[in-house]
UniProtKB/Swiss-Prot annotation:
Tissues of expression: Expressed in roots, stems, leaves and flowers, mostly in vascular tissues.
Designated name of the protein: Leucine-rich repeat extensin-like protein 3
SUPFAM superfamilies: L domain-like
Chief location category: secreted
Species of provenance: Arabidopsis thaliana (Mouse-ear cress)
Length: 760
């Protein structure tokens, strides 16, 4: 029997060999291309992802680094399984600096030679994987591939990219555990992993790394936030739509550079830190759609810079402190779907507020008396019972030594809790006031982050209303990946998010000024709208976001409207920026797709998301207490104008000098409150971090699935003609090292790759 099997295998080998020879161009010997093709197919199934590239001796290269770049890019080209827009069709020959999406600049250690400093293939709809050979691009400063269909994992040899400043892998189909190789990149400042399928825990080392922006929302991460969370120097961090649980870390109050933070739609279950008021520079604070309990700390009234405050869809109780509603910059306060029993009259005079579904006497649309009675009859929450980290000094009571045996020992002294002094860090530079026009949070059902599938190119402003993806499927993605236009053509890349379909209006846009604007162009919305989640506490099943219209699989990203997107919404495949020339300035417009595909990024996109369809509020639950976390959070549109100064000028194109970006301008997370209320936030141009929602997971080669239908995306239609965030070269507050890296700074561009601003 064994011999028979061996004979069959031998004949099978001969048949395959015959077929291979039959396709040979010369009839007898396989061409180099055919050999590489066979190798690539084998590598997809076996061994590590690496390809042997043979360099034609007749090719001449300016220097060895460009030769290495040729090898890396040819290996990558072979790892591409689908390139419907022919972005890599001109990746031929030795002049790698003329390849579409590849940008060269003088080397940092030798200005006389050119080297590949940036790669920008945003919104190219390419399917494939990242080969290990990419580690040969030793001078690479920025790597932007958002809104494609890349799958697999991040190559281990990325650890050789010692100059990499911006890494944007958002809105793809990467999977597996957190890519720890990014922790080995010494120059990395901007990390965007949004809208992928990463899972498991996030290494605590991430929060000790010197980063300025962390976007890991819309994945499948599940873990408790570590005690060193507060050690992170970031100005913007978005963890929304994952499966984090446990405490809100008490160390959170130590994040002195923090401008925007979004915990929305996770499973956090604790009280808010009592000294949360130490966050003096925060402009956007969103902890909606969790399971937080206890009162709203009085110290929230000390967060003097906050513009967008969202604590909706939790189980908070007590009275709203009047000091919170008197904050000087507060524009949108959403505290619906809790169990608050009192609010100061001043709260009713805020520009935008939502107090529905509480237990407030005399106010409309409150919970039923039965629900309120059932909840309030329970024992009050003891916030000290949560072990939430290092805020409490010695937990155990201090026991004084017992006196002599004859005397009874005195009772041990009560434990002493040292409360850290509140920091009064000066408020962040006054960024333009973000425009918060989030509609009031819809009924319990979390607002759907349904990135509207904008079918046509940039027609309507993209509406990014990502549905909360609490359910099994990956969270609907508002895609925040700012894809730079990457069509083969040389024209400068337009990072304008594709126009979202008019139907689903984005949730309220919070445009906090301070946060840095990461304008990663949002992936083009795909036609399919995201479903509206109007469900009660249980988060609606995440609908896989519709694939962005353009290749980007995910549907439109939310509007994290970072700096106003350049007017040009990248047409489905806007041509990539000219080869070496620096790309146009991209305000870190993350996803906000400019309304019209205008190649010039500066124009502010007009976001007039159609009013979200009325979200059908599920009838108030019976008297039973709604302890279950409220429905998935509504899409939060923090359209905070990009913080003026954040300039990570590491645009993909020409040499970008990565001077450590000044503290990014305020990122605008437009996390819409429940759809019903449309908050037209103030002047600041909304920053749309519209990273397209990640396309539903599909085979690598599969095009992104259409986005789910968006139900009631609350964002009120607004045309935000917010000029791109001032790209003022401010010294970045965070002392980021000046990156005089391969790419010269792109004027007016914050983070070169329009990383979707922090949002979902």
């Amino acid at each position: 029997m064994k011999k028979t099997i061996q004979i069959l295998l031998f004949f099978f080998f001969l048949i395959n060999l015959t077929n291979a020879l039959s396709i040979s161009s010369d009839g007898g010997v396989l061409s180099d291309n055919e050999v590489r093709h066979i190798q690539r197919r084998q590598l997809l199934e076996f061994a590590e992802r690496s390809v042997k590239i043979t360099v034609d001796p007749s090719l001449n290269f300016e220097n060895p680094r460009l030769r290495n770049a040729y090898i890396a890019l040819q290996a990558w080209k072979q790892a591409i399984l689908s390139d419907p827009n022919n972005f890599t069709s001109n990746w031929i020959g030795s002049n790698v600096c003329n390849y579409t999406g590849v940008f060269c600049s003088p080397a940092l250690d030798n200005r006389k030679i050119r080297t590949v400093a940036g790669i920008d293939l945003n919104h190219a709809d390419i399917a494939g994987y990242l080969p290990e050979e990419l580690g040969l691009l030793s001078d690479l400063a920025l790597f932007h591939v958002n809104s494609n269909r890349f799958c697999g994992t991040v190559p281990h040899r990325f650890n050789r990219l010692k100059l990499l400043f911006e890494l944007d892998l958002s809105n793809n189909r990467f999977a597996g555990k957190f890519p720890t190789v990014v922790l080995q990149l010494p120059s990395l400042k901007f990390l965007d992993l949004r809208f992928n399928e990463f899972e498991g825990t996030v290494p605590k080392e991430l929060f000790s790394k010197d980063l300025d922006a962390i976007f890991i929302n819309h994945n499948r991460f599940r873990f408790e936030l570590p005690e060193n969370f507060g050690d992170s120097p970031v100005s913007v961090i978005v963890l929304a739509n994952n499966r984090f649980h446990g405490c809100v870390p008490s160390s959170l109050v130590e994040m002195k550079n923090l401008n925007e933070i979004i915990f929305m739609n996770n499973g956090l279950n604790s009280c808010l830190p009592s000294d949360i008021g130490r966050l003096k520079n925060v402009t956007v604070f969103d902890v909606s759609f969790n399971e937080l309990v206890g009162p709203l700390p009085e110290s929230v009234g000390e967060m003097v810079s906050v513009e967008q405050l969202n604590v909706a869809h939790n189980m908070l109780s007590g009275k709203i402190p009047a000091s919170i509603c008197q904050l000087p910059k507060l524009e949108n306060f959403t505290y619906s779907y809790n169990f608050f029993t009192g609010e100061a009259p001043v709260c009713l005079r805020l520009p935008e507020f939502d107090d529905r579904r509480n237990c407030l006497p005399g106010r409309p649309a409150q919970r039923s008396p039965g629900q309120c009675k059932a909840f309030l009859s329970r024992p009050p929450v003891n916030c000290g019972s949560f072990s939430c980290g290092r805020s409490v000094s010695p937990r155990p009571p201090v026991v004084t030594p017992l006196p002599p045996p004859s005397l009874p020992s005195p009772p041990p002294p009560a434990p002493i809790f040292s409360t850290p002094p509140t920091l009064t860090s000066p408020p962040p530079p006054s960024p333009p006031p973000p425009v918060y026009s989030p509609p009031p949070p819809p009924p319990p059902p979390p607002p759907v982050y349904s990135p509207p599938p904008p079918p046509p190119p940039p027609p309507p402003p993209p509406v990014y209303s990502p549905p909360p993806p609490p359910p099994p499927p990956p969270p609907p993605p508002p895609v925040y990946s700012p894809p730079p236009p990457s069509p083969p053509p040389p024209p400068p890349p337009v990072y304008s998010p594709p126009p979202p379909p008019p139907p689903p209006p984005p949730p309220p846009v919070y445009s906090p000024p301070p946060p840095p604007v990461y304008s990663s162009p949002p992936p083009p919305p795909s036609p399919a709208p995201t479903p509206v989640y109007c469900t009660r506490p249980p988060p609606p099943p995440p609908h896989s976001p519709p694939p962005p219209q353009f290749s980007p699989p995910p549907p439109e990203p939310y509007y994290y409207s970072s700096p106003p997107p350049p007017h040009s919404s990248p047409p489905p495949h806007s041509p990539p920026p000219p080869h070496s020339p620096p790309p146009p300035i991209y305000p870190y417009l993350s996803p906000p797709p400019p309304p019209t595909p205008v190649s010039s990024p500066p124009p502010t996109p007009v976001y007039s998301p159609p009013p979200p369809p009325p979200c059908i509020e599920p009838p108030p639950p019976p008297p039973c207490i709604e302890y279950s976390p409220p429905p998935p959070p509504p899409v939060v549109h923090y359209s905070s104008p990009p913080p003026p100064p954040v300039y990570y000028s590491s645009p993909p194109p020409p040499p970008v000098y990565y001077s450590s970006p000044p503290p990014p301008p305020p990122v605008h997370y437009s996390s819409p409150p429940p759809p019903e209320v449309h908050y037209h936030s103030p002047p600041p141009s909304p920053v749309h971090y519209s990273s397209p929602p990640p396309p539903p997971s599909a085979p690598c080669e599969e095009s992104p699935p259409p986005a789910p239908v968006v139900h009631h995306s609350p964002p009120p239609p607004m045309v935000h003609h917010s000029p791109p965030p001032p790209v003022i070269h401010q010294s970045p507050p965070p002392p980021s090292p000046e990156y005089e890296g391969p790419l010269p700074p792109v004027i007016g561009v914050s983070y070169a790759s329009p990383p979707p601003p922090p949002f979902y």
